[in-house]
Regions:
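Divalent-cation
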Residues: 1-169
Length: 169
């Protein structure tokens, strides 16, 4: 995931990826095209390739799968946002205001990678901070071990084992 975000950032390919958490996103998924594919850099980069049918709109990720692409999101009503933030950023913030989803945005104009969570935007994420944020976000203490263990291939088995055992190895 992080590799594909960095590749798109470097090439200035805009992207919006929404990670479903506890709040279901069925209505949003229904607005797009069903994909149901395993997360991979080539798939993500192909979806967001400019001038292709799926590149507009958001990709929705559930667990370790891309469930839909070209999904329509409601924009935030926050009029205090900087004018330099476009529709992609406003949509990313909007979905996180009404759900517990987390959105990752790659700016088409600047290549800047940002994250929206709880209606707030964090900009200028580099590879290290993106890895840390995604790992922390998807390995919280209050989720059952079965959910965590399904993340091992996405974030690394060692990180999942440490979180489950509660100690550092």
């Amino acid at each position: 995931m992080v590799r594909s975000l960095n590749n798109m950032s470097r090439k200035r390919i805009g992207a919006l990826i929404v990670f479903e958490r506890r709040t279901g996103l069925a209505d949003v998924i229904d607005s797009g095209t069903v994909i149901d594919g395993e997360i991979s850099a080539p798939l993500i980069e192909n979806i967001f390739e400019p001038n292709t049918p799926l590149h507009d709109g958001a990709v929705i990720v559930r667990g370790e799968r891309i469930v839909a692409a070209a999904c329509i999101l409601q924009l935030t009503d926050d009029h205090s946002l900087s004018r330099e933030l476009g529709t992609r950023h406003r949509a990313a913030i909007g979905i996180t205001e009404s759900t517990d989803a987390v959105s990752i945005i790659v700016s088409e104009e600047t290549g800047i990678i940002s994250m929206a969570r709880d209606g707030k935007l964090t900009r200028y994420l580099d590879t290290k901070s993106l890895n840390i944020l995604l790992t922390e976000l998807f390995m919280p203490d209050d989720l059952p071990p079965a959910w965590l263990s399904s993340r091992s291939s996405l974030f690394g088995a060692r990180a999942v084992k440490q979180k489950e055992d509660g100690d550092e190895e």
